[in-house]
UniProtKB/Swiss-Prot annotation:
Alphabetical keyword list: ATP-binding, Cytoplasm, Kinase, Magnesium, Metal-binding, Nucleotide biosynthesis, Nucleotide-binding, Transferase
Amino-acid positions noted as binding ATP in the UniProt annotation, renumbered to this chain: D40, G41, E42, R99, Q100
Major localization class: cytoplasm
Gene designation per UniProt: prs
Location(s), subcellular: Cytoplasm
PANTHER family: RIBOSE-PHOSPHATE DIPHOSPHOKINASE FAMILY MEMBER, RIBOSE-PHOSPHATE PYROPHOSPHOKINASE 1, CHLOROPLASTIC
One GO term describing the cellular component: ribose phosphate diphosphokinase complex
Designated name of the protein: Ribose-phosphate pyrophosphokinase
Length: 318
């Protein structure tokens, strides 16, 4: 009996190309489901094959349009539950609303990441797979198992393949030091940190570089790139301090608000991302943006969960 017997993968409209890659690696067909809209825009999901007793994975990033993709995911999970699926795992490579994970200084704001966690559990999700959560503590918002996997093996593999000379890993802020230090250790290279601070109110933010960057090939490591404003400014500052080249590696290409044009016109030599979020036409047209596939990592994660094997051992050396 194959270890993939009983394993089924379904997807919504967020990233069907990634789902197709995953099932191709697993050697199984993509689950048959109709995901459409009623005339008033409401989402309709119909599961079009037998899932009774099956181990079902729903692959759906909650990227833009965030609310549509989130509702598709929850409605599909409910449809699968009512069709008697044996176990339902939501594979959410990019977990939307993750940046709203706390109340800063007791501001009157929602902790939206917790709201989303509650909604997914109520819908019937029994396990979560996500990749490079913006805040690790979001795992604690769930009362079900959460496998937060890392894109490090993908990004690290590309860095080793590129074999950049005089490599220096740069953390874009103090909060990213742990991630950047781990990468620097794997690459056996030095680490620099960008310390962003605002000297006083109504004064522009200043970037200070902690570390020697002159003559080095700098690699900025982050979990996501959104508008790319800070990233492009960091690349400019590094070049002004004498860096030969500046590359950026990030897991999630949110790339909103004209980010592709900003990157194209910046001092950044290249931005390397994964395909947890499909690239827009503007991003695909940008010669400085390159995407790596996360399908192999996701397929192996699905397979290990199906077999009952360790997932974290995938990252023992990352």
């Amino acid at each position: 009996m194959s270890s993939h017997d009983g394993l089924m993968v379904f997807t919504g409209n967020a990233n069907p190309a990634l789902a197709q890659e995953v099932v191709k690696i697993l050697g199984i067909p993509l689950g048959k489901a109709m995901v459409s809209r009623f005339s008033d825009g409401e989402i309709q999901v119909e599961i079009q094959e037998n899932v009774r007793g099956k181990d079902v994975f729903v692959l759906q990033s909650t990227c833009a349009p965030t609310n549509d993709n989130l509702m598709e995911l929850m409605i599909m999970v409910d449809a699968l539950k009512r069709a008697s699926a044996g176990r339902i795992t939501a594979a959410i490579p990019y977990f939307g609303y993750a940046r709203q994970d706390r109340r800063p200084r007791s501001a009157r704001v929602a902790i939206s990441a917790k709201v989303v966690a509650n909604m997914l559990e109520i819908a019937g999700v029994e396990r979560i797979i996500t990749m490079d959560l913006h805040a690790d503590q979001i795992q604690g918002f769930f009362d079900i198992p959460v496998d937060n996997i890392y894109a490090t093996p993908i990004l690290l593999g590309d860095l080793r393949k590129q074999n950049y000379p005089d490599l220096l890993v740069v953390s874009p802020d103090v909060g990213g030091v742990v991630r950047a230090r781990a990468l620097a250790k794997q690459l056996n290279c030095d680490l620099a940190i960008i310390d962003k601070r605002r000297p006083k109110a109504n004064v522009a933010e200043v970037m200070n570089i902690i570390g020697e960057v002159e003559g080095r090939t700098c690699v900025i490591m982050d979990d996501m790139v959104d508008t790319a404003g800070t990233l492009c400014k960091a690349a400019q500052v590094l070049k002004e301090r004498g860096a030969k080249q500046v590359f950026a590696y990030a897991t999630h290409p949110v790339l909103s608000g004209g980010a592709a044009d900003r990157i194209a016109a910046s001092a950044l030599d290249e931005l390397v991302v994964t395909d947890t979020i499909p690239l827009s036409a503007e991003s695909l047209a940008c010669p400085k943006i390159r995407a790596l596939s996360s399908a192999g990592l996701l397929a192996e994660t699905f397979s290990r969960i199906r077999r009952g094997d360790s997932v974290m051992s995938l990252f023992a050396e990352s």
